[in-house]
């Protein structure tokens, strides 16, 4: 098993799609039962979120990955992303997410938010 930490979302920085996640958007998010997917594909569940919390930078995630192939991708510096439902947003120059329902966390090759990355890996 491999464990990793990283940021699935970065606050107050526009992503490549023109979305901005604001502090507090994940205030109701819980780790319990949140899957880790490969490239947002529900058929490729590779682990589970152990803990998540908002800090000054964004949504910090710690997760366990059981998929042996995922360890190499993690160590290569995988990007992170998240699946969500919008609960509250403001539209303007950017779409600003004020409240989101977290569905999943994904390891991705090209994250919409380039700063959303795995920052530490331990284990196999």
State what each model feature region is.
Residues 3, 48-124:
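Residue microenvironments linked to proteolytic maturation
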Residues 33-42, 80-81:
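Short conserved beta-strand and strand-loop elements enriched in small hydrophobics
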């Amino acid at each position: 098993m491999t464990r990793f930490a990283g940021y699935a979302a970065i606050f107050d920085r526009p992503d490549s799609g023109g979305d901005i996640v604001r502090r507090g958007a994940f205030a109701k998010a819980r780790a319990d039962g949140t899957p880790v997917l490969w490239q947002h594909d529900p058929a490729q569940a590779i682990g589970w979120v152990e803990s998540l919390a908002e800090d000054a930078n964004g949504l910090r995630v710690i997760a366990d990955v059981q998929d042996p192939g995922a360890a190499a991708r993690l160590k290569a510096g995988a990007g992170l992303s998240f699946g969500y439902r919008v609960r509250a947003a403001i539209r303007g120059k950017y779409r600003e997410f004020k409240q989101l329902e977290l569905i999943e966390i994904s390891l991705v090759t090209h994250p919409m938010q380039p700063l959303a990355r795995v920052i530490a890996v331990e284990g196999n």
